[in-house]
Amino acid sequence: MINTRKFIATATLSILTITGFAQQKPILGTEKLKKYVEYFNSIDTEAVKNYIPNREAFKWLSDQAPLFECPDSVLEQNYYYRWWTYRKHLVKTPEGFIFTEFIEPVKHAGKYNSISCALGHHIYEGRWLKDNNYLKDYIKFWLYHADVGQTKQRFHQFSSWVDDAVYQNHLVKPDQGFLKEILPALDKDYGKWESERQLKNGLFWQNDVKDGMEESISGSRKDQNQRPTINSYMYGNAVALDKISVLLGETAMADKYKNKATAIKKLVQDSLWNTSASFFETRKAKGGSADVREAIGFTPWDFNLPDDNNNYAKAWDQLLDTAGFKAPWGLTTAERRNPTFRTRGTGHSCEWDGALWPFASSQTLKGLANLLTNYKKHGKMNANIFYQELHQYAASHVKNGKPYIGEYQDEKTGEWLKGDNPRSSFYNHSTFNDLIINDLIGVKPRQDNILQVYPLIPKNQWDWFILDNVSYHGKIVTILWDKTGTKYNRGKGLLVFVDGKEIYKGKDLKPLKAKMD
């Protein structure tokens, strides 16, 4: 265990421009990718084939996905597994490309088996693929096509942080023309959410099932409960629309959304923070807190909403407590000490009263990474904890000894609670690779020409790693750590290449900023 707070606080962020040697060819070839894809193909019956069938998976991923190698075989295998499964969900429709959530058709889906629940996760994950047109089609599908010809709402069938995700996608693959094209639709959609879900007190309400989190301890299918989820999402969306508007010179719109974000932030901190529990909790429709800690209480950090102080950071103590969220197989969706924890049945519905949901795990890990990266007050949290929980999350991707991602799991045994229901296989309802690229390795997308990297790898955890073939700002980025210099033979330390040119070299694995040209 290291004192990561001290490590982060004392790390020097240096801006360097170094004239280095040209990288003659990719340092990490595709041999490892090929090995993994062949293995994954060999254990798959491929009951459903979409745009990229298994036989084309290796070629497509070679062209599209960043390559990754590290000493942690669990993280490494799962990284390639999650790209392999994500690829399965790419569907070409008459209205453009989309990504599905379920591999099998489900009754509650819209056109082409589309579901908006995990849209934000899909965009965060897919922004690292080389061809961004898939996501642009997908975003426009939801803005312009998803509700056409439907008997009920599809886009607003679930809460969404789509505006935030659109902006985060832009930071990786800049395209102001695309933002300008869709900004009127994003603005209109935000107003629609306000008309449908904003109360007179300024907070947003949501049924837990419309958060994709039914049968929760604090939730309801009828009551207008004010949940940390939708309020955090709407804050994140307002912040993103402010930034997009500034980028496009839309001053009045920027001011409008800046004011909205400021108002929501204050309301969340004033109304959803339970001082006695030191946690963000659901506010009941009839008033007062739901008096239960749930993983959704970490969601405000996904959007850097809470103030940077020790009082709010204390919420994260619950990650370490076995009566809180810490369980043998991962992080629970509700505190284990609650008397009604895991009492709403198993497998017959989609219970969110404590079982492990990858949807929530990836949200919580993103929030923790933001705390460690963007805040000064970390409470008891450090890079070791982030790494351990990310590793556990990766290790949970297993069923009958083989790689698997499903809907939700028992927190003690790891049993997938939908059993062998074919709809659950390859469930595309969470992120993983974004957590590796954006958070563990720490590529921090920006609008300018500075490449920023903020690793959350604990000191002395790894002697080497490489993240290669990262498509960023129209360039190809490689980040390499070689403690001894003998793994990749490019010299000792942390090295960064852009389009084959070395732009940074340092002896320590620490945060850095470097000009890309």
Predicted segments, located by residue:
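The feature captures the catalytic groove of carbohydrate-active enzymes
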Residues: 25-49, 56-59, 148-160, 191-260, ...
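Bacterial Sec-dependent N-terminal signal peptides
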Residues: 1-25
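Extended glycan-interaction surfaces of carbohydrate-active proteins
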Residues: 73-111, 128-152, 195-226, 266-356, ...
